[in-house]
Amino acid sequence: MRVLIADDQRSVGTSLADMVRCCKHEIVGVVGSGLEAIQAYNHYRPDLVLMDYWMPKLNGATACRNILAKDPSARIILVSGWAPSDDTRGSGAIAILPKPLDLDRLEAALNDVAESLRASAEATISLTSIVSRAGADG
């Protein structure tokens, strides 16, 4: 799975990237602001974005809403030590993970997203097969 990380603290972003790699996933980029997260998402189209809530130029929830406005299928997990619950709930993020983040919790979240991606891909393949057969029969 291809993952984009957005955290304004470089050391946290690097640590998070190392944890994601440890779980056998690919890092497409590590950026330091909500604005950079939007730009990087548009460029890389990752399978998942792990995004800090508190960042300069645009907080994580606002960046999340911006990404989802352009790509409703985007999968974004907010990561934060503390964030206003109203803002995070309305962000569209699929999950909110508390900092400090432990490897077990991160791995479980990554596995959930990877399984969701597999199920979605299988459903698309099945639907394509049904449509193809219907066209051949029709």
Description of each model-found segment:
Residues 52:
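Active-site residues of response regulator receiver
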Residues 6-7, 31, 49:
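Conserved sequence signature across two-component system core domains
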Residues 30, 56-57:
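The feature encodes the CheY-like receiver
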Residues 33-36, 59-62:
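Acidic catalytic/metal-coordinating carboxylates
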Residues 10-29:
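Two-component/phosphorelay signaling modules centered on CheY-like receiver
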Residues 101-112, 122-126:
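C-terminal output helix
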